[in-house]
A protein has these predicted regions:
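C-terminal alpha-helical "lid" subdomain
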Residues: 12-57, 64-65, 294-362
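Walker A/P-loop nucleotide-binding motif
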Residues: 116-137
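AAA+/P-loop NTPase substrate/partner-engagement loops
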Residues: 143-177
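The catalytic "switch" region of P-loop NTPases
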Residues: 160-161, 211-213, 233-315
Length: 362
């Protein structure tokens, strides 16, 4: 691995690079090779650097590459005998295509029980953790089982937590979304008091008809604090002992900060909202890759060897603020982009299987 880093990337070991160079030269001479200019071409190709030292430009390029959308080239599909991209969004045709771990199964079932029987929960995960996939799976399951649940999803296209960056989602807009979804033929009242009375009435009428209602807000980390406080009042709309509206918030870790118990502004919400987190794949990485490839008719060993899986895990695990802590970026989207890029590179250079060196070369 050290030699591969020197040859491919001109990355010398941090400790004793001179000693390593001397030993390499000695070995080359023992093979009858003139070492006078052996390292000149390498020096001309790039300025030597030691492993573990990166400038801001190269670090930025690596981060951008991890976030960039990757596409499986036609030549790559042909080389590996694939007829479709197993990691593409289009490969997600139904609930059978959703990869699950014990943690994901819990979140999946908690979402359904909240929608079906009531509750207030927040699903939090990094970008690419699979939040939107679980939201689509919830809608699919409700439709498939013909459950008496009405899903209300306000449009959040321009939503931000202040009016400088975009438009804040206010309680009035949420009320409009609920009324328009449950009673689309009714005209929405203009005055605030009349509108909220109308909201309460249509919820009660729908509930008496046997329906449950769930309000699903994606990108909830962009909700302003006042709207979060108002959601508690939506949640408290009742008909007798029955709650009329369940609430599901889906957002990135910034939402967890807003829902912190140390944030006294939203203490009423925090006491009522269950927060669940979508964790990285970590120990389930190999199962994830196997599942995705099997859905496309391939085995993991047809595409990559064991060293590639370890290299993917190492590539997407970074040291945290403390040396002993590792920050895992093993989320489905990041893993998929890295694997697709590695497969494209393997096909380009003619390697039959993705291995650790190919992953490192991406």
């Amino acid at each position: 691995a050290t030699l591969a880093q020197i040859v491919n990337h001109n990355a010398w070991p941090r400790t004793s690079p001179g000693e390593v160079r001397r030993r390499l030269a000695s070995w080359l001479e023992s093979q009858g090779i003139d070492t006078t200019k052996s390292f000149d071409a390498v020096q001309g190709a790039a300025t030597p650097r030691t492993a573990g030292t990166t400038d801001k430009t190269s670090l930025s390029e690596e981060e951008n590459m991890l976030l960039k959308k990757q596409v499986l080239f036609p030549a790559t599909k042909k080389a590996f005998g694939l007829f479709r991209d197993p990691f593409a969004d289009e490969a997600m045709q139904g609930s059978d295509d959703v990869f699950t771990t014990p943690d994901i199964r819990y979140v999946r079932e908690a979402l359904y029980q909240t929608a079906r029987h009531g509750g207030f929960m927040a699903v939090i995960g990094e970008s690419g953790a699979g939040k939107s996939t679980l939201r689509r799976d919830l809608t699919e399951r409700i439709n498939r089982e013909n459950a008496p649940v009405i899903v209300i999803e306000p449009y959040i296209i321009a939503m931000e937590d202040n009016d400088v960056k975009g438009k804040t989602l206010k309680a009035a807009a949420i009320a409009e979304a609920i009324i328009s979804t449950i009673a689309p033929l009714e005209s929405i009242r203009r005055s605030q008091d009349a509108r909220f009375r109308q909201l309460h009435r249509v919820l009660k009428d729908s509930s008496q008809a046997g329906f449950s209602h769930v309000l699903v807000i994606e990108e909830a980390h962009s909700l302003p604090i006042p709207t979060l406080k108002h959601l508690k009042r939506f949640f408290e709309l009742e008909s007798g002992f029955k709650k009329l509206l369940s609430i599901v918030l889906i957002g990135q870790p910034e939402l967890a900060t807003k829902l912190s118990e140390r944030n006294m502004e939203v203490r009423e919400v925090v006491q009522r909202c269950e927060v669940v987190e979508l964790l990285p794949l970590d120990n389930n990485l190999e199962e994830f890759l196997t599942f995705k490839l099997q859905r496309a008719g391939k085995q993991l060993t047809d595409i990559m060897d064991a060293s590639a899986v370890d290299a993917i895990r190492a590539r997407l695990s970074n040291p945290g603020s403390h040396r002993k802590n590792m920050v895992s970026l093993l989320y489905p989207l990041a893993v998929s982009n890295l694997v697709i890029a590695a497969m494209n590179l393997a096909a380009e250079i003619g390697v039959p299987q993705v291995n650790a060196d190919v992953v490192k070369g991406v």
